[in-house]
Amino acid sequence: MAEVGRTGISYPGALLPQGFWAAVEVWLERPQVANKRLCGARLEARWSAALPCAEARGPGTSAGSEQKERGPGPGQGSPGGGPGPRSLSGPEQGTACCELEEAQGQCQQEEAQREAASVPLRDSGHPGHAEGREGDFPAADLDSLWEDFSQSLARGNSELLAFLTSSGAGSQPEAQRELDVVLRTVIPKTSPHCPLTTPRREIVVQDVLNGTITFLPLEEDDEGNLKVKMSNVYQIQLSHSKEEWFISVLIFCPERWHSDGIVYPKPTWLGEELLAKLAKWSVENKKSDFKSTLSLISIMKYSKAYQELKEKYKEMVKVWPEVTDPEKFVYEDVAIAAYLLILWEEERAERRLTARQSFVDLGCGNGLLVHILSSEGHPGRGIDVRRRKIWDMYGPQTQLEEDAITPNDKTLFPDVDWLIGNHSDELTPWIPVIAARSSYNCRFFVLPCCFFDFIGRYSRRQSKKTQYREYLDFIKEVGFTCGFHVDEDCLRIPSTKRVCLVGKSRTYPSSREASVDEKRTQYIKSRRGCPVSPPGWELSPSPRWVAAGSAGHCDGQQALDARVGCVTRAWAAEHGAGPQAEGPWLPGFHPREKAERVRNCAALPRDFIDQVVLQVANLLLGGKQLNTRSSRNGSLKTWNGGESLSLAEVANELDTETLRRLKRECGGLQTLLRNSHQVFQVVNGRVHIRDWREETLWKTKQPEAKQRLLSEACKTRLCWFFMHHPDGCALSTDCCPFAHGPAELRPPRTTPRKKIS
């Protein structure tokens, strides 16, 4: 064997050995946190087992010449006892996480540590979902696999037995030591550039008493039976020597190690990158407030769907007409669409349905999510208060409506299966309510971003939680009050707000709809001390529902456009209810304005902006700090770069009316100076005159494609320094990206819009 890495733990305090096992659980359940070429891992089974005594022992080797005292595992004083491990009743799925804080959130306290080391993983969080997924492994085959492996160890593979038990030279491993054994499937990322996409199975042997965890790859023999490979076997171990803690990575038979660069990296990566992460995680005492990533769906199915959608809709990035970042918004919506498609696919399998679910996206924004879901066969539409430029590019098959949604009896969707709220802002808390009152079969998916209550902004009430965590709990409370089982999951999207809430089923039978709706009404009324409604606007219960036996699926676009008025009247006639109020469910709600107000200083008059820019520039240039630099042709040129002032110092030099005018804009003075990036640099709260000689050096280091894009944007605006700086522009006309005079101006490059089929 060979030790490929060993590191000491700094300042362990009381975190070890518990922290070591928490770090190991991250690598076991969520290996993609460290290895970015993996999609995740699926834990298929977990059970307790015992290694046999060796019938014939050969010389064993140790990780090094130094004799080590093994650190106690979770069974020795760290998590403190508890029941032994038991086999899983069904396959479990290890879930993914893209942030270290989330990954380290598991198993930090002693009781939780013992659970992580010795009992089955928690269920996926929703009934009937964990069973029957891909990769199921029969218990009989597991018994046979482990029995064959144990016999091979006892009969002649003494070196591997010594490696598993971390025995020193010439020593015998303890007989019948209880071990935790995990069968896991490692799932590579599906990518056109990675030919290896087949998941790999392995057995993981966790010796909690000896402080080791060993990874044993599996392979199929000629008859299709799984057996343990003798190559690519490695071990992570915790040791304790002279009051110091160490983590080591060892490889059994390094000459047999075959690196594919994905599931099995190079040994140097294990001994450096992985070891460094394990050491860091072991001493981080962080607890996450959020669920693991993709905990409600199959990671394997999601990875495949995401790559297919990403390839299918990648052209959207090239034709994106909005001012927002296309890389972020396109791939974020692709990831959300992939998640929903797998969630709905598994729901159809669970409910034994064939028709694809219908949907309405409330506050659909750019409409790309609606376009993808519709293109993938789900009937639906999107509604937003403001039309976007990109809507014209989708084509007639993508149904998008410009309309304001006010929660009332006229904005219900009785024949729709799912309501979607993707960053739906002021509609976010209302979506569970609208879904609950639309029909008993209507479900919801929300991805909260901005914090809104039923009326206005959400106000924090618990300082011990982050505002984001508290707001998520509020939306979950709304969903539960509306009668939903609310599941929480974390998406893989390029956003800090990536926790979604899913309401798939109800907590009550359909016969109790009227009483539950009464509670909904009272809850909404109780939020933030809602005042008594004026006459004609009484907040009365709204017993609107569709019988549980109804189909609940859209039958063409006509069904999507159906309203709930006839349903409400039928219910009222049957139950003797009086007429319902026609107004909003909660007076005071205002949908966002159709015309979005620009508050980034861009709407200020050009003369005013130019005046402030010139005033601040003269203020900075008053410092008379001359600097001499070589120009591109090799000659020396002295140029006044000005001094550096803080934003507060700059603001003190501006008159009161100018500051008042800037204060009405988001960001004020700083935003205006950042917008004038040709002239200024704002770094760490200090304002500098931009030196374009440094920018030119940066440009020459860019890839050829990036340089071509930059050159296409040249000479479309006048050079401020050529026009206003006392020393002129620091660059020659050939090197400056801006026009030295009107004669050099070029028309801006425009990209023709393409229709998206």
UniProtKB/Swiss-Prot annotation:
ZnF (C3H1-type) intervals: 713-743
Entries under PROSITE patterns matching the protein: ZF_C3H1 (PS50103)
Chain spans, region Disordered: 55-93, 108-138
E.C. code: 2.1.1.211
Zinc-finger in keyword set: yes
Presence of keyword DNA-binding: no
Modified-residue entries (Phosphoserine), positions: S78, S533
InterPro entries: SAM-dependent_MTases_sf (IPR029063), tRNA_uracil_MeTrfase (IPR011671), Znf_CCCH (IPR000571)
GO biological process: tRNA methylation
Subcellular location: Cytoplasm
Biased composition (Basic and acidic residues): 123-136
Catalytic activity: uridine(44) in tRNA(Ser) + S-adenosyl-L-methionine = 2'-O-methyluridine(44) in tRNA(Ser) + S-adenosyl-L-homocysteine + H(+)
TM helices/strands, residue ranges: none
Residue ranges, compositional bias (Gly residues): 72-84
GO cellular component terms listed in the entry, alphabetical order: cytoplasm
UniProt KW keywords: Cytoplasm, Metal-binding, Methyltransferase, Phosphoprotein, S-adenosyl-L-methionine, Transferase, tRNA processing, Zinc, Zinc-finger
MF-aspect GO terms: tRNA (uridine) methyltransferase activity; tRNA(Ser) (uridine(44)-2'-O-)-methyltransferase activity; zinc ion binding
Similarity-based family: Belongs to the TRM44 family.
Role according to the record: Probable adenosyl-L-methionine (AdoMet)-dependent tRNA (uracil-O(2)-)-methyltransferase.
Protein name as catalogued: Probable tRNA (uracil-O(2)-)-methyltransferase
Gene field: TRMT44
